[in-house]
From Swiss-Prot:
A single GO cellular-component term on record: membrane
Recorded superkingdom: Eukaryota
GO molecular function: transmembrane transporter activity
Protein role: Probably transports organic cations.
Species of origin: Xenopus tropicalis (Western clawed frog)
Keyword Transmembrane helix: yes
Protein name in UniProt: Solute carrier family 22 member 15
Keywords: Glycoprotein, Ion transport, Membrane, Transmembrane, Transmembrane helix, Transport
Membrane topology category: Multi-pass membrane protein
Entry-listed glycosylation sites: 52, 58, 83, 513
Pfam families, A to Z: Sugar_tr
Length: 534
């Protein structure tokens, strides 16, 4: 019996898996979102003026929002007038030093870049649970250090380390949850996590509204992380990972444990051993020496890069709207919420599926960004008054949020279990490169006001078109090994493809191109080449 069949016996989404979903897709994502966007408040610039002429850095008079916070020391000529503190007022990151706020954001995503690729390989080797728990514990520690750091260089270092842990453990937690539930619930779990990430942005804005000291704010948000860590100590290891590693007894015990916690009366069963094609030695060569994985990976790397670039680029650009920073941040998160129910409906619709939804959201989001250059301001009164740069930017944010949600789910289904975490880590690595670059894209407006949106739009449309070259995974069984990639059930499904999945293996041979024995031998040769390269 395969793992998927065993999960049907013990429960694909029972009581305990609902608890795991609440822990890893709700509570954890609320905390992860906080650490990911915390710099939007910690790095906010309070209104200020120069004591010599009461003028702000750009030559306009500063606004009074609350008690004055005069600067001290060598920066004593600066007076901050806001009713909140930030790293800007702490270390005087104004004027020529203002760029250092963007650097702190890029440093974080640089850490995430390291985390997603290194944690992927670590969890494939040492297990999902120990790598996830260790990463979460270290993130809480480094985040507390970040709140207490006395100097800006140490602040940058701890932000980098928080990024490493946040990016790495979030990816592993996502895979761990998916490998503990039935494949038919992967989309729901992924959408729930993305939904809670958006809620986490609004939650952080609410907390920041009441806590105006950046140090106290950065410290208290880790209470949630510590609570999630305590609850994570008792979760099981992934049965799919144990099975892929050839640890059949432990995999069976893990599945039986899920059954008991789901209150299922499960009879004994025996898992079939799997080919040890790359379970113990998978690395980047395993992916790029396989033609199918290589094509999928190259396309998905660009898609992940674009999703991150446009998502964070539009988020940072929303800061130019003016008004209350807490309200703007909350709306930025809440604006994503409509994307997820729509996304859930479309990715499970047989006429759209994963591939069609991803391509559609990317193209619509990119098209909205391109339209901004045609309507830079308000278009007047009447129905067309809603067609302005702010509305189109919000539409782009909504669509790219949906695409970001789909790309996690879709990537999980494109890779076999033996390299799933590694493959997602490689793709997610390029997403973080997009995050590193994103803080600097809005600065292109100094060359031409529409240039940032042209970049976002062109990137989104190109990624959407390229994603059409990928296979559809809706209703297809999850591949476990490299050999499964060439099996008929894993090929692109036709309208009646779902029915084909239940036909005997002998009948499936009629739907393949060429001899199935030749395909299997070719795949085994590829596996041997991978092992030889390692």
């Amino acid at each position: 019996m395969e793992v998927e069949g065993a999960l049907k016996l013990v429960g694909e989404m029972g009581i305990y898996q609902i608890y795991l979903s609440f822990l890893l897709a709700v509570l954890l994502q609320l905390y992860s979102a906080t650490e990911a966007i915390i710099i939007t408040i910690l790095g906010a610039t309070p209104p200020y003026h120069w004591m010599n002429d009461s003028l702000t850095a750009n030559g306009s008079r500063g606004k009074q929002y609350g008690s004055q916070l005069p600067a001290e020391g060598e920066h004593g000529h600066v007076v901050f007038d806001g009713n909140f503190t930030s790293i800007v007022s702490e270390w005087f990151l104004v004027g020529g030093a203002a760029y250092e706020v963007s650097v702190s954001s890029s440093v974080y995503f640089g850490g995430v870049l390291i985390g997603v690729i290194s944690f992927g390989q670590l969890s494939d080797r040492f297990g999902r649970k120990p790598v996830y728990v260790t990463g979460l514990a270290l993130e809480v520690v480094f985040a507390v250090m970040n709140a207490l750091t006395p100097i800006f260089p140490l602040f940058l270092l701890t932000r980098f380390l928080v990024g490493v842990m946040n990016g790495g453990m979030s990816l592993v937690a996502f895979v761990l949850l998916n490998e503990c539930i039935g494949a038919s619930y992967w989309a729901a779990a992924g959408s729930l996590g993305s939904l809670c990430f958006a809620v986490g942005i609004a939650q952080f804005a609410l907390i920041g509204y009441f806590i105006r000291s950046w140090r106290l704010l950065a410290l208290l948000v880790n209470v949630q992380g510590a609570a999630v860590l305590a609850l994570s100590l008792c979760i099981p290891e992934s049965p799919r990972w144990l099975h892929a590693q050839g640890r059949l007894r432990e995999a069976q015990e893990s599945l039986l444990s899920l059954g008991r916690r789901n209150r299922r009366k499960v009879t004994s069963f025996t898992l079939c051993p799997r080919q040890k094609d790359s379970a113990h030695s998978a690395n980047i060569l395993t992916i790029y020496s396989n033609a199918i994985l290589r094509q999928r990976t190259l396309i998905m790397m660009w898609v992940w890069f674009v999703c991150s670039l446009v998502y964070y680029g539009l988020t940072l650009s929303s800061g130019d709207l003016g008004g209350d920073i807490y309200l703007n941040l909350a709306l930025s998160g809440l604006a994503e919420l409509p994307a997820y129910p729509l996304c859930m409906y479309l990715i499970n619709h047989k006429r759209v599926g994963r591939r069609g939804s991803l391509a559609g959201f990317l193209c619509v989001g990119g098209g909205a960004c391109l339209l901004i250059m045609l309507v830079p301001g308000k278009t007047g009164s009447g129905p067309l008054s809603v067609l302005n740069s702010q509305t189109l930017s919000l539409l782009g944010k909504l669509n790219i949020s949906a695409a970001f949600n789909i790309v996690y789910i879709y990537s999980s289904e494109l890779y076999p279990t033996c390299v799933r975490n590694l493959g997602m880590g490689v793709c997610s690595m390029f997403s973080r490169i997009g995050g590193i670059i994103a803080p600097f894209i809005p600065a292109l407006r100094f060359a031409h006001w529409a240039l940032p949106f042209i970049v976002f739009g062109a990137a989104g449309v190109s990624a959407g078109l390229l994603s059409l070259l990928l296979p559809e995974t809706l209703s297809a069984p999850l591949p476990e090994t490299l050999a499964d990639l060439r099996g008929a059930p894993y090929r692109r499904l036709e309208p009646d493809g779902e029915a084909m999945l239940h036909r005997p293996q002998a009948e499936l041979g009629a739907f393949t191109n060429g001899s199935s024995e030749e395909d299997e031998e070719e795949e085994l040769d590829a596996v041997r080449e991978c092992q030889a390269l390692i």
